[in-house]
Amino acid sequence: MPTVNQLVRLGRKPQKKKTNVPALQACPQRRGVCTRVYTTTPKKPNSALRKVARVRLTNGHEVSAYIPGEGHNLQEHSVVLIRGGRVKDLPGVRYHILRGSLDTQGVKDRKQGRSKYGAKRPK
């Protein structure tokens, strides 16, 4: 507990909040190159094969990023854009790949929620 004199001299320092997405370095998105594209299984009550890519970012960080939507065209050396946002049942996956930008195609035949999956408006 500080004294009144210490508070007058130094004041209170605001506590810094730890970021959930350190590799983005306060940017909304980051570009990177896929080093490995693979599937992995989720945590205990769930069961699936989740699509994940290991991405080397332009700032040198290497992160795991989730590939949302049904089907994708990513392979090694694909250039992708990642955003923050974790996948709750995949430990260590804190980023999402943005569909429909750079080398990532949008989800085919997507009718609803298209903007999140980079799908064009159906004719």
From Swiss-Prot:
The modification 3-methylthioaspartic acid is found at D89. Coiled coil: none annotated. Residues 102-123 are annotated as: Disordered. It comes from Magnetococcus marinus (strain ATCC BAA-1437 / JCM 17883 / MC-1). This is Small ribosomal subunit protein uS12. Keywords: Methylation, Ribonucleoprotein, Ribosomal protein, RNA-binding, rRNA-binding, tRNA-binding. InterPro entries: NA-bd_OB-fold, Ribosomal_uS12, Ribosomal_uS12_bac. With S4 and S5 plays an important role in translational accuracy. Part of the 30S ribosomal subunit. Contacts proteins S8 and S17. May interact with IF1 in the 30S initiation complex. Belongs to the universal ribosomal protein uS12 family. The lineage of its organism: Bacteria, Pseudomonadati, Pseudomonadota, Alphaproteobacteria, Magnetococcales.
